[in-house]
Structures are given as C-alpha cells and as structure tokens.
Amino acid sequence: MDIINIAWAALMVIFTFSLSLVVWGRSGL
C-alpha cells in the first residue's frame, strides 16, 4: 500500500461523507 493511495482514499471518503452530510442537512432531517 502506498501512502499517497491511502491519503487519496481517505480524502475521497471524507469528501463524500461531508457532501452527503450537507445534502442530508439541507433536506430538513
């Protein structure tokens, strides 16, 4: 496992999570 691949995967997970959290918050739940 390359450290760059791990960092990129973690960045994608955090970005997807925060994006879905913003969408979930805007839908009023």
From Swiss-Prot:
Cellular compartments annotated: Plastid, Chloroplast thylakoid membrane
Coiled-coil region: none
GO molecular function: electron transporter, transferring electrons within cytochrome b6/f complex of photosystem II activity
Pfam families named in the record: PetN
Example of a GO biological process term: photosynthesis
Record's keyword annotation contains Secreted: no
Taxonomy, superkingdom: Eukaryota
TM ranges: 3-23
Annotated InterPro entries: Cytochr_b6-f_cplx_su8_sf, Cytochrome_b6-f_cplx_su8
Keywords associated with the record: Chloroplast, Electron transport, Membrane, Photosynthesis, Plastid, Thylakoid, Transmembrane, Transmembrane helix, Transport
Principal cellular location given in the protein's record: plastid
Protein topology in the membrane: Single-pass membrane protein
GO CC annotation terms, alphabetical: chloroplast thylakoid membrane; cytochrome b6f complex
Family: Belongs to the PetN family.
HAMAP family the record matches: Cytb6_f_PetN (MF_00395)
Quaternary structure (record): The 4 large subunits of the cytochrome b6-f complex are cytochrome b6, subunit IV (17 kDa polypeptide, PetD), cytochrome f and the Rieske protein, while the 4 small subunits are PetG, PetL, PetM and PetN. The complex functions as a dimer.
Function according to Swiss-Prot or TrEMBL: Component of the cytochrome b6-f complex, which mediates electron transfer between photosystem II (PSII) and photosystem I (PSI), cyclic electron flow around PSI, and state transitions.
Record-given protein name: Cytochrome b6-f complex subunit 8
Gene (name only): petN
